[in-house]
Amino acid sequence: MAEVRPAADDFESLEPSIKNIVEQDSLKWIFVGGKGGVGKTTCSCSIAVQLALTRRSVLIISTDPAHNISDAFDQKFSKVPTLVKGFQNLYAMEIDPNLGFSNLPEDYFEGPDMMSMGKAMISELLGAFPGIDEAMSFAEVMRLVNSMDFSTVIFDTAPTGHTLRLLSFPSVIEKSLGKILSLKNSISPFISQFGSLLGMQDLNADQMTSKLEETLPVIKQVSAQFKNPDHTTFVCVCIAEFLSLYETERLIQELTKSEIDTHNIIVNQLVFPSKREECNLCEARYRIQHKYLDQIQDLYEDFHVTRLPLLTHEVRGVDKILNFSSNLVTPYKP
């Protein structure tokens, strides 16, 4: 077999690891995303594990409808933060990103039947703003997560299109709720009259919008943090193939447009041919990947590019994730 140049010889300009993320204590929000099938969940869980070694408390949230973090950790998670087995400071939860405002729990609207009616009316009102229904569900999750005071929160996101929508939620909510709350004084007399007709003397706009008013400051804070590189960063995960590289470039352009920091790329599932064994398929695969690694080097010379190997086994369970995650901070050598 012809000798080939190791991929690890590339990318000398910046540390080829996520040490910069681990060592940046100010980071509050870390998003991990990319094209489907590139190993985002394994990378998300590995980042979470590495951060748990140095942070006070870490939460990983799956916003992917497939909810693969349960499979990765080999432990069932729900919409409530649950301690990951084997850790004292790492929690995981799974949320359904497709739930809308109407799916929020009843205790979101504290009070008697009047508030249930308020929920229905506000739901109809919010329906006039495209994207706000789904965004409000995300807003409630962010409000709860914010109140739990985790040191760092990692989002294991769905494929690229949904991820970009997720990141736009704070600005969607800020604009839409601002408009709704600005109308409150105008519609308040009509709501009071409507309540009187139904024999509900206490029904008023203040009660109906109280939760929205609680949510808006949190969302403004989160929106500001998302655009602050001291608090938020995005880790792009890809494989060394044309479609994945194309999707990564599109993602980075959108993140830049949205003013969201990104300076880490993880290239997953790389083949490192053995000099001891003949493997024509491995060498052919390596040469294809190396072509795209060269392109990544040219395109993203100001990024930390971490290379992860294609393994012969699944990365499932805490022990295997811990072992695999070491490649994120210590560059892999075949």
Swiss-Prot record:
Belongs to the arsA ATPase family. It comes from the Eukaryota. It comes from Nematostella vectensis (Starlet sea anemone). Zn(2+) binds at residues 279, 282. Its EC number is 3.6.-.-. Homodimer. One of its GO terms (cellular component) is GET complex. The lineage of its organism: Eukaryota, Metazoa, Cnidaria, Anthozoa, Hexacorallia. The keyword ATP-binding applies. Signal peptide: none annotated. ATPase required for the post-translational delivery of tail-anchored (TA) proteins to the endoplasmic reticulum. Recognizes and selectively binds the transmembrane domain of TA proteins in the cytosol. This complex then targets to the endoplasmic reticulum by membrane-bound receptors, where the tail-anchored protein is released for insertion. This process is regulated by ATP binding and hydrolysis. ATP binding drives the homodimer towards the closed dimer state, facilitating recognition of newly synthesized TA membrane proteins. ATP hydrolysis is required for insertion. The keyword Phosphoprotein does not apply. The active site is at residue 64. ATP binds at residues 35-42, 241, 268. Its main location: cytoplasm. This is ATPase ASNA1 homolog. GO terms for molecular function: ATP binding; ATP hydrolysis activity; metal ion binding. Keywords: ATP-binding, Cytoplasm, Endoplasmic reticulum, Hydrolase, Metal-binding, Nucleotide-binding, Transport, Zinc. InterPro entries: Anion-transp_ATPase-like_dom, ATPase_ArsA/GET3, ATPase_ArsA/GET3_euk, P-loop_NTPase. GO terms for biological process: tail-anchored membrane protein insertion into ER membrane. It is found in: Cytoplasm; Endoplasmic reticulum. SUPFAM superfamilies: P-loop containing nucleoside triphosphate hydrolases. Gene3D superfamilies: P-loop containing nucleotide triphosphate hydrolases.
